[in-house]
UniProtKB/Swiss-Prot annotation:
Lineage: Bacteria, Pseudomonadati, Pseudomonadota, Gammaproteobacteria, Enterobacterales
GO molecular-function term, one example from the UniProt record: DNA binding
Protein name: TrfB transcriptional repressor protein
Classification via Pfam families: KORA
InterPro entries found in the cross-reference section: Fimbrial_Adhesin_Reg (IPR053721), TrfB (IPR032428)
Length: 101
């Protein structure tokens, strides 16, 4: 699935995000305009990883601002058996959200 945003979603995502103008231009080109990341790597002389990171920063900001109501994002370091359970909960929650759409 290609990650895409509308211009208004993009503007909401970058609101308050501390990134440079180049990052914003790259992310808009990829997420809003649908241009391939390779285009920016070539034209700006950047590595693919740098371009991917720019896009990821904006996408992650969008996801953080658009969690379903009643949901929270968590990061934790757990023993493997507990991490397995949490991953299972995450998969179940994703399925539940997909059926609501």
């Amino acid at each position: 699935m290609k990650k895409r945003l509308t211009e208004s979603q993009f503007q909401e995502a970058i609101q308050g995000l501390e990134v440079g103008q180049q990052t914003i231009e790259i992310a808009r080109g990829v997420l809003v305009d649908g241009k391939p990341q390779a285009t920016f790597a070539t034209s700006l002389g950047l590595t693919r990883g740098a371009v991917s990171q720019a896009v990821h920063r904006v996408w992650a900001a969008f996801e953080d601002k658009n969690l379903p109501e009643g949901y929270a994002r968590v990061t934790a370091v757990l023993p493997e058996h507990q991490a397995y359970i949490v991953r299972k909960w995450e998969a179940d929650a994703k399925k539940k959200q997909e059926t609501k759409r």
